[in-house]
């Protein structure tokens, strides 16, 4: 199959500082998986990227989530992590702003995926060792980059709680899987290798703030944002 190729722009910061760690993704939308990986009527049960296997569906506290998109984050020859985005309903959202939101937590400029109710998961499979400080700084700066000053200030108390949770996670070794889950009626839960860490942080709006790190108004790249949303096939190199 012929793929479109996208060359990522350089990150604005050094790769190991804050939000720069979350930039420059290589993404393939999950809706192409049957075409890429199926044989006959057999649909693949997992995808492989950078020697990492991501299941195409995962159970989460009674919910069944489907892989919506996945990506490899790297800098030159260095592979940093694989990311997988899971949703309860694997609908393919558009990055346009003309979709009427049924979720009060979503902003008018948010993609349609934000208005889809239900559980969600972001999985980061680390390909290098990282400290709790590196992880928390990356999440904090990614949220700050995608919210105005007033909204960021309003989120700050819960961001501080997220930083505390990440301290509980501690240093994460290469190969570890960091899950950031949204549980309806509960909130955001962080787990390392399926072991929950810290408290659950309430509010769907807070989970959407985390999703905006990759899918907000200042994503790593707009083409990659659309690819993670399933709007097109983008395989990038840097």
Where are these regions (language model features)?
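Bacterial N-terminal signal peptides
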Residues: 23-39
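Mid-length scaffold segments of soluble, non-membrane domains
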Residues: 91-185
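Short strand-turn-strand beta-turns centered on an Asx-Gly dipeptide
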Residues: 192-196
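N-terminal secretory signal peptides that target proteins for export/translocation
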Residues: 1-22
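Flexible glycine-rich active-site/ligand-binding loops centered on an Asp-His dyad
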Residues: 199-222
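Boundary at the C-terminal end of the N-terminal hydrophobic targeting segment
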Residues: 38-40, 44-46
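N-terminal secretory signal peptides
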Residues: 45-115
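Cysteine/selenocysteine-centered motifs that mediate thiol-based redox chemistry or coordinate metal-sulfur cofactors
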Residues: 222-238
